[in-house]
Amino acid sequence: MKRILATTVAALLATTGLALAPSAGAAECPSGNFCVWQEANFGGQRANWSGDDGWWESWISDTDSSWANHGISGPGIKDHVRVYENAWQGGGMTICLAPGQEVGYSGAANDRGDSHIWATGC
């Protein structure tokens, strides 16, 4: 039963583009991804996405404490990341990251993120 559950979870994570990993730093955020950690200074569990997500999974929703934008940048590319306090980009924007920006902690954005989109600017 445990093997079936583990296989199912792995398949689900692979299809949604979400990855879980303990992280020691922002450098571990894969190229082309936006990453969020549960702890300040890129500690604890990490979630990463290469696309938009209108409804973060419950373990990371409202527990985000550090962020890194390692997205691809270029003319006309949506390379900024806007994080919102409610699902489906509802409520206010809690933080916006420019290409390459890494934020180890923000009191204004801490534990408030529920969704994000890639955009052409903040």
Task: Please describe what each predicted stretch is.
Residues 2-9, 14-17, 22-122:
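Compact beta-sheet-dominated domain cores in extracellular/mature segments
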